[in-house]
Amino acid sequence: MNTILRTLLFEWKDRKLPSIIERDIRLDTSSQQKINNATVITGFRRVGKTYMLYDAIKKLFETQTREEVVYINFEDERIIAPTTDLLTNLIPEIQAIYGQKPKYLFLDELQLIPYWSKWVRRMLDTESLQIFITGSSSKMSSAELPTELRGRAWEIKVTPLTLKNFYALKM
């Protein structure tokens, strides 16, 4: 599993971000209040949760380096039968590859990893970083947010495009 994790981290170093359509809602990555709290982005499939992460990452790249901002998509087909070890090794692998710990972690579809919420809680308690998580609303909502994260996570619900966004896309 470490080989896959290393591959994903090396690929991230050179990955180009896709074009992004601005939405009415954007992630706030500047607030120091978010350290020791996670931001959980939920919504139906294909409503733009991942692109919301990309938008925030693109904005962060104006002041931060790739080594400080790390994105991992846990829906990657190379992550087969994931275990908690994948998460346990994440920060040490990032540090080994990039030479430093990240300031921002963007974890797409994290709910696919067993015991993910316990790991996030440990990171919030022991590391100084901002964590952004996406998950489909059928698997991760405020009503179903694990008890480990209650009071430690802000939820942002993403809805389908507004009519204004839709027209902007078509223009």
Locate each region found by the language model.
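Phosphate-binding site recognition
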Residues: 1-171
